Structures are given as structure tokens and as C-alpha cells.
Amino acid sequence: MKHSYFISDLHLSETQPELTALFVDFMQNLAPQAERLYILGDLFDFWIGDDEQSALIQQVKDLIKFVSDQGVQCYFQHGNRDFLIGERFSKETGAQLLPDYQLITLYDKKILLCHGDTLCIDDEAYQQFRRRVHQKWLQRLFLCLPLKVRVIIAEKIRAKSNQDKQAKSQEIMDVNQAFTAEKVQEFGVNLLIHGHTHREAIHQQEEFTRIVLGDWRKNYASILKMDESGEFGFIKD
């Protein structure tokens, strides 16, 4: 039966090879069988520009290109850790870049896709930070810096982010329910798929269904499968 996959929040890095191994297994065995593959952000733990080169980055790009070459339509939506992924990455992998909110039609279902961080409006400090770093002039300035400097800046931002999370309540870091409902209504859908919060779940709400993709962990890959009958669910080992 025809089907498609949705994943997010892998946070791939050289320090967690077990996550890379899970991704390799998925991309070599499951992904090539799909019609579409949607990666909804935070594929990498951080991204400092398309000009960065490493064995891990090349391996990931090669895997996406391999799946794309099998005829699978691959899509990438920016996360809060890898929002600087650009056109060079897209060309090298065959993955189409999507905007912050993307409306798709899949198996006769209208679906709204987003990474999920834009729905967490109660975290005002993060939203202010997000608005700053998404300014195009600031991104251009950052990308002009030497790679070594960008790495230092990215590591400091990541450390600060991890520190801040310890002081924030779980409620603040989750989606705002009212705002999320407004977005769903704005796009005229009854199905929303997002990641970011790392709280894998399928929320059957009164007027719409909200599917939250989970983060990938040492022994678990959060993979949502949707088939042509319209059925969906997370793949369980």
C-alpha cells in the first residue's frame, strides 16, 4: 500500500552516533519504499551554514540524495536548530525546502505542517530570540563569519538554550492550545502535524487532530506513517 513518512527532531551530531545509526537504517530500508518523506526540522543538533563540511553532514546528505534518487519526494522544514539550512543543501540532497507553515494534500487529506516552535507562544523569551535570529540581515552577517567563529557562537547559544530549559515550566515550552486552534482554522484543515516539543502523541481534539512527532533517542526512532487509506500511526518495533 502506498504510504509516506514524517520525522523530526533527530538532533544528529557527532557526539551521538547511535542516532545516526538509526537514521541510516531508516533511510536505507524504510524511506525508499515511501512516496514522500517529510523532515519537519531539527534534523541536525545545530547548523551553521551550508558551507560547513564534515563526515556526518556528508553522510546525511548522501542518504537523503539516495532516497530522493529512488523517486521519493523529500521535503525539509526548518527547525529551531537548523533554520540556516539553505538552497545549497536542497540542491545537493534533492529535498525541497518548505516555509514555516506548509499546507499539503496527501491521500485526500488536507494537512498543515510546521516544526512546532512557532506554536509555543507562551515562551516569550524564545519567541523574541527567534524573531532576532530570523532577521535576514543578521543571518547574512553570521554566514560571513569564519566557520570556527560560527561554531563557537552556535555552541554558546545551544548551551544557553539547554540552561534556560531547566528554568522553564513544561507548560511554557508546549504549544499554546488557543493559538494552535486559530492556526488550524486559518488554514482550513482538521489535521496538524508538528514536532519540536519532543512529546510524541496523537491528540484527537473536538475540531481537529494534532499529531506531535517525537524526538529520536538511543533505542527509538519516532516515525509517523500515513498510508493511502488515510490511516496514520507511529511505527512500533
Swiss-Prot record:
Q: Which reactions are catalysed by this chain?
A: UDP-2-N,3-O-bis[(3R)-3-hydroxytetradecanoyl]-alpha-D-glucosamine + H2O = 2-N,3-O-bis[(3R)-3-hydroxytetradecanoyl]-alpha-D-glucosaminyl 1-phosphate + UMP + 2 H(+)
> Where does the record place it?
Cell inner membrane; Cytoplasm
Gene Ontology molecular function terms on file:
manganese ion binding; UDP-2,3-diacylglucosamine hydrolase activity
Associated pathway: Glycolipid biosynthesis; lipid IV(A) biosynthesis; lipid IV(A) from (3R)-3-hydroxytetradecanoyl-[acyl-carrier-protein] and UDP-N-acetyl-alpha-D-glucosamine: step 4/6
Q: What is its EC number?
A: 3.6.1.54
Q: What does the entry comment about cofactor binding?
A: Binds 2 Mn(2+) ions per subunit in a binuclear metal center. May bind a third metal with significantly weaker affinity that might facilitate the catalysis but only binds LpxH in the presence of the substrate.
Outcome of altering D117A? 2-fold decrease in catalytic activity
Q: Which cofactor does it need?
A: Mn(2+)
Q: Topology versus the membrane, per the UniProt entry? A: Peripheral membrane protein
Q: Which residues bind Mn(2+) 1?
A: D9, H11, D42, H198
The record's keywords, sorted A to Z, are: Cell inner membrane, Cell membrane, Cytoplasm, Hydrolase, Lipid A biosynthesis, Lipid biosynthesis, Lipid metabolism, Manganese, Membrane, Metal-binding
Q: Which GO terms describe its biological process?
A: lipid A biosynthetic process
Q: Which family does it belong to?
A: Belongs to the LpxH family.
Q: What is this protein called?
A: UDP-2,3-diacylglucosamine hydrolase
Q: Per the UniProt entry, what species is this protein from, by scientific name?
A: Haemophilus influenzae (strain ATCC 51907 / DSM 11121 / KW20 / Rd)
- Lineage from the top down? Bacteria, Pseudomonadati, Pseudomonadota, Gammaproteobacteria, Pasteurellales
The gene that this protein is the product of is lpxH
